[in-house]
Amino acid sequence: MDHRLVAWAREVKARERRRDPPARNIPVLWLFTDALRVPDPQAAVAALPRRLCGVVFRHDGAAGRAALAKAVSRQCRTLAIPLVVAGNARLAAAVGAGVHLRNGRRTADGGLRRWLRPAALVTSSAHSGADLRRARTMGADAVFLSPTLPTRSHPGAPALGIVRWAALARLARNEGMALGGVEGRMVRRLPRWCRGAGAIGALMAAGADDVCCRAATVFRDCHN
């Protein structure tokens, strides 16, 4: 667990509380699950700081994804941790979660409000102004602008960098969050009006992400 990142997130949350009018109660720090880097999402969720975090459940293509989503949803309700399911509004509704859109696009199962309850959270990723506009049209409560910096999930992929991230975040108005390469040692380079961040390795136990990243690298090498 990156305690510098957690401390920064607590400061962001304190600023959010002082806003006038107060912002909707949206977590400022989000764990993004990943079948390779977070093989045990329930253990990762159990370790999250309380009253600060949300969870974006991905685990795309994982065997038993629906059953795992149901188990994670039950755990998140017990711990009062908001949960969104990536890319599948029908599954999100079935487990009582919100939904996470990719690039602001509709989910493959026919959209959002057809399945979700009215108060359900909607988050989205965005890599460009066009993605951001789609996300806002879809009513996203939070938009993760990514990749902010080089990330271990996508080695070699081009990153926005702090300057481009800030320019895109200004277009996001009140919804912009950072995702990709987010760690405590860099997060204070983000503008003070950053609304929060998403992370994988920084929210896992010390050393756990290194092991999972090596396993993921071997997996990718064997399947390329």
Describe these PLM feature segments.
Residues M1-A43, R114, F219-N224:
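N-terminal amphipathic alpha-helix/helix-capping segment at the start of soluble metabolic enzymes
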Residues P21-I26, L48, L203-A206:
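N-terminal ligand-binding/catalytic initiation module
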Residues W30-A35, C53-A135, F144-P147, A178:
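Catalytic beta/alpha-barrel core
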Residues L31, N103-R114, A142-G156, G184-N224:
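Glycine-rich phosphate-binding active-site loops on the catalytic face of alpha/beta enzymes
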Residues L36-D40, H127, L160:
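Short secondary-structure boundary/capping elements
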Residues A43-C53:
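A short, Lys/Arg-enriched amphipathic alpha-helix followed by its capping loop at the start of a domain
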Residues A44, L83-G98, H127-G139, W165-A199, ...:
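Catalytic cores of alpha/beta
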Residues A69-K70, A157-A166:
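Charged helix-capping and loop-helix junction motifs
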